[in-house]
Amino acid sequence: MRRKMQARDEEKILVGMDAHSEKLELCVARWTHGSDPVRCKSITTTVDALESTYSKQVPQGSLTLIEASQNTFSIVERLRRIGYEAKVLNSDVLKGMARRDRINDRIDAENLAKAYARGNGREVHVPGEEHREYRDVLFGYFAATKDALRAWNRVWGFCSAHGMKLPKGGRLNSVKDVETALEEAHLTKTQRFVGSMDIEQYKSAMDLKGRFQRQIELTVSKNKDMQALMQILGFRFIVSFALVAFVEDIRRFPNPGKLVAYVGLNPRMNSSGKDEGGNAMTSYGIPHLKALVTEAAQISLRHGEAPMHRWARRKLAEGKPYNKVIGGLARKMVVYAWHVLMGHPAPNCEMEASFTRKLELLGTRIGKDELKAQGFADKRAFAASIACLFYPKTSASTVSHDVCAATQANTGGLCERPAGRLGTPPRDKKS
């Protein structure tokens, strides 16, 4: 107890940082537990001069506090490289701490240190370098998808404005029909030029989207966690990739409810006294991930036969609103994903057939050259080698000795002790 009291009484240096794209404002303050930090000095510098400023003016052993923003993670990584500890606080940590007539970067930097000292700041997880790359690829894919949709809407709008036959769908096959209609339509030279440029923009956007999608598929073909999530009906390459990219380490979430809240699929609570309030879905969470899981829930509702799918259809038959049922099914799928990533046994193996089909499709997408580079003869060998890690029956009946040998070479011998259904951890020899 005395040691704990001494540790609390020790003085610590806090550095509040208000970061912008080019400018940095630092507040170096002394802090003792149980009191507000006392400002020692304020430093104005630039992002390029971060390392030199810290080495000259910030003492070693200090703790830097940064509000979450676009370039926060890169700043934290640079500070850690030169031996400084840094933490990222939630973006709304300064809400209500400053008067409207006293707001500037210096005051915000000082308030960041005060918020942390008072326990008001919620720490934000800083992803590792590999998972930051995953997020960059994912955001690039989302941006390319949005650009492709906008470009297709321009093509559709051009056809509608000039009385041409409206294209159906958004696939490249429809582009050929539009190009044919463009040649046959009675248009001026300028109008044909505008229409052809809209088509070129759409082709370019679809090509960019395809490149990002291939990068995602190549990553999934080499990542065991992403492959394990594909066992869940409705989770294919994009959803599995996105979930692992944001979750990173599943041990950050002690129970599945924490992961559900992280995604943003939990109901909000707003009750006081006799007024219970509403229980609509919270607006917090990760919007992209929430949308992907919700779409996956709609797909699994149409095709799934597992208990959670039968539960959802039963609720619809009872008259429950469709959106609420989809939200509930999406929550169940996230809970399922938590157990899969934790390596817990699954209650059934009904999804083994769809899992194998997804793996074969993944093998088709990455191509024969990539399959040979990974040591597989064809897509069936690729699918069977991965399935044997999760379904022991598959390894005993459908996977040849050569395939298991290739899997051992690629996974470090994991095929010798199959993981079991839906990521069941291998049993210890003593048990």
Residue ranges and their predicted role:
Residues 6-30, 112:
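Gly/Thr-rich phosphate-binding beta-strand-loop-beta motif of the actin/hexokinase/Hsp70
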Residues 29, 33-62:
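Nucleic-acid-processing active sites and adjacent nucleic-acid-binding tracks
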Residues 61-69:
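Short glycine-rich phosphate-binding loop at a beta-alpha junction
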Residues 87-125, 132, 178, 182, ...:
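Short alpha-helix plus adjacent loop in nuclease-associated cores
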Residues 139-228:
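Glycine-rich, often acidic, oxyanion-interacting loops/wings at catalytic, nucleic-acid
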Residues 228-231, 237, 242-322, 404, ...:
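Phosphate-backbone recognition surface of nucleic-acid-processing proteins
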Residues 274, 311-431:
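Low-complexity, acidic/Ser/Thr- and charged residue-rich accessory regions of DNA metabolism proteins
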